[in-house]
């Protein structure tokens, strides 16, 4: 167990050891000057003032208080507006954040994939993970803030103000990254994507939260719901109340419900992400088709079918193929299929690494008739468990200094990320006979056995989702 006062340097060493990096492999290092505090901002922050007012606070209302239903169309419009007047520096900043969250995302995905069985499937959001950690960074004071910054991948070096992350810039860039994924490209663009994030802050009764922290979350989670309830008397009952409340507020069936937290917890941070992609030009095939979970077991699932010119690559050396399908003006769905079902684990370990985007350069356009399952993937994971596996169990533990979240001595319980990932056709049900495209003979690509997927935003290079599809309608 790492001591609470772990130095910044030791934290970085822990992170690098967990990531399995040798010094010569640090090709990902990048000048993150766009993400740290500017000199003028530092001068203002460091100017002594005896009249600095205390941060205003809010007291979360009881969990019985009703919340307006989540309006996902309004959230979509808000994300799109955030990208309408981007300057070059905003896009560069988003690219820097994309680099950081991809780096962290691949390592966390590896940890999750080793923990979850192949049969259970997996869907993971690097953006939600990075946003959650950045949120805690904005609420932290040293030494916790320095340790979180190192974990986010930006060593503070001299630890001066101008080497410290500006959490507001990072959260704003995360909003940009989300907006770029769903932004339309005009009348001829792809079908609309929905990407909605809701954060629930659940506190012990009477605990006060600082308003700047709560308001700052709106960049990546436009809807933040602070609620209070008894977390200690019956943790199982508290978990049931939270699950009912979030389902009532969002209408989303997130699958695996929140389990009971430790009875001494005073704050639970739960981020819920709903993604719905519609594949333009694809239709739902009549009836159900067998999806082979393994060589002897199949399940009937609805399938989507479409034809067009997609980017494709068959890697015979590593026994895999990759198909790239546009989802929006800036977003792509990447489908990675092992040539043999038993090779799924090997392909997963090979593909989901830091050279993932480099491999995409091998793709070339080709006429394809693509058949892919309709997807409803669900997953939940506790960031506290991931930190323990990273040998940083105290990072958000009892001794964490989270003085920008509350003046109370917080005890952070579960830090949950839950994902609901849906992939559908944008058209009606296809006729029994699907016409083939004119021109070159189309390659038949059918994903009717376990495969991998990724959702990429090309402008920032950020990976929004990574997944392993074992059961298209029940991966959780």
From Swiss-Prot:
Chief subcellular location: secreted
Pfam families: Serpin (PF00079)
SMART domains: SERPIN (SM00093)
Any single biological process term in GO: regulation of systemic arterial blood pressure by renin-angiotensin
Stretches the record annotates as Disordered: 45-64
Residues bearing attached sugar chains per UniProt: 295
Annotated S-S bridges: 42-161
Signal peptide: 1-24
UniProt xrefs under InterPro entries: Angiotensinogen (IPR000227), Serpin_CS (IPR023795), Serpin_dom (IPR023796), Serpin_fam (IPR000215), Serpin_sf (IPR036186), Serpin_sf_1 (IPR042178), Serpin_sf_2 (IPR042185)
Protein localization: Secreted
Alphabetically ordered keywords of this record: Disulfide bond, Glycoprotein, Secreted, Signal, Vasoactive, Vasoconstrictor
Function, as annotated: Essential component of the renin-angiotensin system (RAS), a potent regulator of blood pressure, body fluid and electrolyte homeostasis.
Protein name: Angiotensinogen
Organism from which the protein derives: Ovis aries (Sheep)
Lineage: Eukaryota, Metazoa, Chordata, Craniata, Vertebrata
């Amino acid at each position: 167990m790492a001591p609470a006062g772990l130095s910044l340097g030791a934290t970085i060493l822990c992170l690098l050891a967990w990531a399995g990096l040798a010094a010569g492999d640090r090709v990902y290092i990048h000048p993150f000057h766009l993400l740290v505090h500017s000199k003028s901002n530092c001068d203002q922050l460091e100017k002594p003032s005896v009249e600095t007012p205390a941060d205003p606070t809010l007291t979360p209302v009881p969990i019985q208080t009703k919340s307006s239903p989540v309006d996902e169309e309004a959230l979509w419009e808000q994300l799109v507006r955030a990208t309408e007047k981007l300057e070059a520096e905003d896009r560069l900043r988003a690219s820097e954040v994309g680099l950081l969250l991809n780096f962290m995302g691949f390592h966390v995905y590896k940890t999750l994939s080793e923990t979850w069985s192949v049969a259970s499937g997996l869907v993971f959001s690097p953006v939600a993970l990075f946003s959650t950690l950045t949120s805690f960074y904005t609420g932290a004071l040293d030494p916790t803030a320095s340790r979180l910054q190192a974990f986010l991948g930006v060593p503070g070096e001299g630890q001066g103000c101008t080497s410290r992350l500006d959490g507001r810039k990072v959260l704003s860039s995360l909003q940009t990254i989300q907006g770029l994924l769903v932004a339309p490209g005009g009348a001829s663009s792809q079908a609309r994507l929905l990407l909605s994030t809701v954060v629930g802050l659940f506190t012990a009764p009477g605990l006060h939260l600082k308003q700047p922290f709560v308001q700052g979350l709106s960049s990546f989670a436009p809807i933040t719901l602070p609620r209070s309830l008894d977390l200690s008397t019956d943790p199982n009952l508290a978990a049931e109340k939270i699950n009912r409340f979030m389902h009532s507020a969002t209408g989303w069936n997130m699958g695996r419900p929140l389990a009971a937290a430790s009875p001494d917890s005073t704050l639970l941070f739960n981020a819920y992400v709903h993604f719905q992609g519609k594949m333009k030009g694809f239709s739902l095939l009549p009836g159900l088709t067998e999806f082979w979970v393994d060589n002897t077991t199949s399940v009937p699932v609805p399938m989507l079918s479409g034809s067009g010119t997609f980017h494709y690559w068959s890697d015979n050396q590593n026994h895999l193929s990759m198909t790239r399908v546009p989802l929006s003006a800036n977003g792509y769905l990447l489908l990675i299929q092992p040539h043999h079902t038993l090779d799924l684990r090997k392909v997963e370990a090979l593909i989901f690494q830091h050279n993932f985007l480099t491999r995409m350069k091998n793709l070339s356009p080709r006429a394809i008739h693509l058949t892919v399952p309709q997807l409803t993937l669900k997953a939940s994971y506790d960031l506290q468990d991931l930190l323990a596996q990273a040998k940083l169990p105290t990072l958000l533990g009892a001794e964490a200094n989270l003085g920008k979240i509350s003046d109370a001595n917080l005890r952070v319980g579960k830090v949950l990320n839950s994902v609901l990932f849906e992939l559908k056709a944008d058209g009606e049900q296809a006729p029994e006979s699907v016409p083939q495209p004119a021109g070159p003979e189309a390659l038949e690509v059918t994903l009717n056995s376990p495969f991998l997927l990724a959702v990429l935003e090309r402008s920032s290079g950020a990976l929004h989702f990574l997944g392993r599809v074992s059961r298209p309608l029940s991966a959780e």
